């Protein structure tokens, strides 16, 4: 897997962590198995006895949902900015206290 795809997958995992509760149970289940358990769409389709195209549509819909919410709320972007700021803090005690507040 090249670096771009790896970064994209990592972002999808993080968006799922942030916005996953907004999905239906079925969407969350399929997306979790696809992204976090690294199952192929065909494996998920076989497991739940549905068409691969159905899984593809659910995954696509999840990504659209995440992108819409991120465009409005920018929780992922703000999280990334906070992490960059934490890295710049040199005082170990202050850094620990701020990390606990996350």
Swiss-Prot record:
<protein>
    <recommendedName>
        <fullName>UPF0122 protein MPN_424</fullName>
    </recommendedName>
</protein>
<dbReference type="InterPro" id="IPR007394">
    <property type="entry name" value="UPF0122"/>
</dbReference>
<dbReference type="Pfam" id="PF04297">
    <property type="entry name" value="UPF0122"/>
</dbReference>
<comment type="function">
    <text>Might take part in the signal recognition particle (SRP) pathway. This is inferred from the conservation of its genetic proximity to ftsY/ffh. May be a regulatory protein.</text>
</comment>
<dbReference type="InterPro" id="IPR036388">
    <property type="entry name" value="WH-like_DNA-bd_sf"/>
</dbReference>
<dbReference type="InterPro" id="IPR013324">
    <property type="entry name" value="RNA_pol_sigma_r3/r4-like"/>
</dbReference>
<comment type="similarity">
    <text>Belongs to the UPF0122 family.</text>
</comment>
<dbReference type="InterPro" id="IPR054831">
    <property type="entry name" value="UPF0122_fam_protein"/>
</dbReference>
